[in-house]
């Protein structure tokens, strides 16, 4: 805008100069024309005066005429000289004016040329500016097009990336769904019964890792199903139920719970404590590898032989036992038959006279008192020989449960003592040797981890008779855990007493301080 305004001012200035030149030239021409007219008028007047004087001289004297003529001639000469001078002046002025006109014209031409040059330069500048603007616009348009193209390419890349991510996410979702389905299928196929303790614990640890729980609680060292069954028996007042583990629950329901599983948070669980006690025995009995491994059987037998431990059913009632087993011959489930057989054995023991029982108990107590420390150490060593930590943890968990159950105040209610409980648990803890040998030789078509259900009861009398030493060891094991629980209770009681004494001492000290403060 500033360049355009300056150019306009210059053009107006040049136009003004040109108009002034034309005005000056017009004025000079008018002056020249007016001077020419004056000269003509003077000449006419002189002519008229000469004529009038000539006429007068003709009438006067001749000398006057001559003088007049001389004067006239002199005047004429003067006039001519004057006219010549005036003419020269006029010519000079005309030449000067022409020079000035030529100078003005030249200046005008120069100015016009300058104006043209300036206009041309301005046009060139404008053209250059327009060209530059066009180039800039083209560059901007090209850059914008490139940016748009880049944005389009980036959008396409993003869309491709998003599509790839969506495909990957879809694949991950599908893989996750497949894994979830596989896990669900595995969970559906995975049973808590008839499965090794190691596999149960691996599955449980995997679940804990998936949930992100790093802390290892005491209850998580054993299978959840075991902890639940033990807690369920306690919560249903099992320790206040007479005949616990001797009286069977609903056997069909036990089999159904073991086969189909159960929801521990359901409100429709069976409230009968005997059902859960039977389910616990079945879980122990169905373990592929017994809770006390087979390789420890020779050590256990040597332990029972060297310590003269005998805690079997009364041999005088063998015939009655055989007759009673024949009553159960129609039952196909070995677990149920074993439970019934232990009931018969316990009933026979209860029918023995009190004198024989007292004598046996006194003898056992004497032997236990004499060899208590050595037997306790040997049992501890045998338990420590179990290589699997998971097996040891499960054995201690079950032992702690039965140790609490065998406390004197509980035995008075349940009527289940160490002797009767050892006979109930032995068939579940120790699989009979003849069946184990048949399994190892492949002579029985079992599943490999459970005793076949089609096995009849005809072999049970001989099986139980062969487990006398195992029953004796289980009796020692139960006494061991009973004493351990008693020690634990005693420690807790001592700790509580110590805490109470400390509280009393603290209270007395506080009272003494208050008394001192009051006295002061």
From Swiss-Prot:
Compositional bias of kind Basic residues: 52-62
UniProtKB keywords: Coiled coil, GTPase activation, Membrane, Transmembrane, Transmembrane helix
Residue runs in coiled coils: 28-192, 480-520
Pfam families: RhoGAP (PF00620)
Low complexity bias locations: 348-372
Database matches in InterPro entries: Rho_GTPase_activation_prot, RhoGAP_dom
Annotated signal sequence range: none
UniProt biased composition (Acidic residues): 140-189, 493-520
A molecular function GO annotation: GTPase activator activity
GO CC entries: cytoplasm; membrane
Name of this chain's protein: Rho GTPase-activating protein gacV
Organism expressing this protein natively: Dictyostelium discoideum (Social amoeba)
